[in-house]
Design a protein with these regions (language model features):
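Long, hydrophobic, well-ordered secondary-structure blocks that form the structural core
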Residues: 43, 49-118
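Acidic/His metal-coordination segments adjacent to aromatic residues that form catalytic metal sites
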Residues: 12-35, 52, 93-135, 152-158, ...
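Alpha-helical scaffold segments in carbohydrate-active enzymes
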Residues: 65-83, 99-102, 109, 136-146, ...
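Inter-helical turn/loop segments and adjacent helix faces that build the functional surface
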Residues: 49-61, 83-91, 117-130, 146-166, ...
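Extended, helix-rich structural scaffolds rather than catalytic motifs
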Residues: 190-297
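Alpha-helical bundle segments that constitute or directly flank the non-heme di-iron/ferroxidase center
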Residues: 24-53, 72-75, 126-151, 173-177
């Protein structure tokens, strides 16, 4: 996908919707977008370092493609912000991590793991970085996407949701890639999957889920139409179970082993096979291939 494709998505209605959002919706929109921008910029910088330790040419190629796509995603977020708000508001949103302690802590958790790998460059820190990527791609991104899909189902910011759907398609493949790398390393490097090391990875996953739930309750809580703190918590715990079991380790939690009934709309909004066509663009947005990938996760 070309970067120019991003500007084919019509955000004129979003420009009108944004000032009319409820205060809680607008605050959540700004903070979640700020977090997603950080995650993509982090990935853009981290993936080239990871690729130095991957010897399989085809996997290396996938990592380079992913790094390129993360840059495209950052452009997409910039396009959204440039369209709906002033340059001053845009900069305020981009740099909220400087003034919002919750956002700074979110960034620090994943950033510290990457920094450890850059400093140590050993097998264990590499494994922890791969797990951190899996958490980032499979929990953090998906939880953020959920909010934008909720706005869209309430008839607001539909262009933003469409941008997110494009990004969601890419993240499906990134998630599949990191899962495949980890599963292959389970076979090739059994010393990296001793009970003690698996416990470290499990603790990372639990901490990622805990932080994401706390973040969701902070930015969404019970103040956004169509969502509440319990729905957010249940969905994120479900994602934690889905990701951990996808690595062959069973479930993290006894509850939320299936997708919550009141959150099935998330999958429907992100479902690549759900063909939607923008009347003005007359362009299909079905992505059958990426959905086939995510079904295995």
């Amino acid at each position: 996908r070309r970067s120019s494709d991003l500007e084919e998505i019509n955000l004129s209605q979003d420009f009108k919707d944004y000032p009319r959002l409820e205060k809680a919706e607008r605050t959540a929109y700004d903070k979640i977008l700020s977090f997603l921008v950080f995650l993509d910029s982090l990935q853009s910088n981290n993936l080239p370092t990871l690729s130095e330790y991957i010897t399989a040419n085809e996997v290396n190629l996938c990592l380079h493609i992913q790094a390129f796509q993360e840059c495209i995603h950052s452009q997409s977020y910039s396009y959204m912000l440039d369209t709906i708000c002033s340059p001053e508001e845009r900069n305020d949103i981009l740099y909220q991590w400087k003034t919002d302690e919750h956002l700074l802590n979110r960034n620090k958790f994943i950033g510290d793991c990457y920094n450890e790998f850059h400093e140590k460059r050993d097998k264990f820190s590499l494994m922890k970085t791969l797990i951190a990527n899996f958490i980032l791609e499979g929990i953090y991104f998906y939880s953020g996407f959920m909010f934008f899909y909720n706005l869209s189902r309430n008839g607001k910011m539909s262009g933003s949701a469409q941008e997110i759907r494009y990004i969601n398609r890419d993240e499906n493949t990134h998630l599949w890639l990191f899962r495949s790398i980890i599963l292959e390393l389970k076979k090739e490097e059994p010393d990296m999957f001793t009970p003690e090391k698996i416990k470290v990875y499990e603790d990372m996953m639990r901490e990622g889920v805990r932080q994401e739930i706390a973040w969701g309750q902070y930015v969404i809580g019970n103040d956004v139409q169509g969502l509440n703190a319990q729905m957010v918590s249940d969905y994120i715990r479900y994602l934690g179970n889905l990701r951990w079991s996808g690595l062959g380790f069973g479930f993290l939690y006894d509850d939320n082993q299936k997708e919550p009934e009141n959150m099935k709309w998330v999958g429907q909004y992100s479902n690549a096979n759900m063909v939607k066509t923008d009347f003005f663009e007359a362009k299909s947005t079905a992505y059958a291939k990426s959905t086939a990938l995510i079904d295995d996760l």
